[in-house]
Design a protein with these regions (language model features):
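Acidic-residue sensor for enzyme active/binding pockets
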Residues: 9, 81, 89
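Short secondary-structure boundary micro-motifs
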Residues: 1, 15-17, 75-77
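Hydrophobic or amphipathic, alpha-helical segments that drive membrane association/targeting
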Residues: 2-11
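Active-site scaffold of zinc-dependent metalloenzymes
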Residues: 47-83, 93-103
Length: 103
């Protein structure tokens, strides 16, 4: 399913807004970026030292548009996959293991 960049960014913002309130203050410093394509076929990528580190790289989460478009065949499915990806990458920020991810 193909969507405009603006529509995809809307889905990403909706996902960010769905982060539980108790975590929001810890993710305010994360830079969320939308990229067109992932050379590795990733849905998302977390880069940073994690929320428990006092100093380190500034945290950045990249969400890849084309990979999500290939994974979904409806707008609703795309929005849900973006939400899962954002929460998954935020989980990495909190140093969570795969089984602990908040989705």
């Amino acid at each position: 399913m193909k969507v405009s960049l603006e529509r995809f960014e809307e889905a990403v913002q909706q996902a960010i807004d769905s982060i539980p309130a108790e975590y929001r203050r810890y993710v305010e410093e994360i830079e969320f970026v939308v990229a067109r394509r992932s050379p590795e076929g990733l849905l998302g990528l977390y880069e940073g030292a994690g929320a428990l580190e006092v100093e380190g790289w500034p945290a950045r989460i990249t969400i890849f548009k084309e990979t999500h478009e290939r994974a979904a065949n409806t707008w609703e499915a795309l929005v849900e996959e973006v939400r899962r990806t954002v929460l998954h990458e935020v989980g990495h920020h909190f140093l969570m293991e795969e089984g602990e991810m908040p989705y």
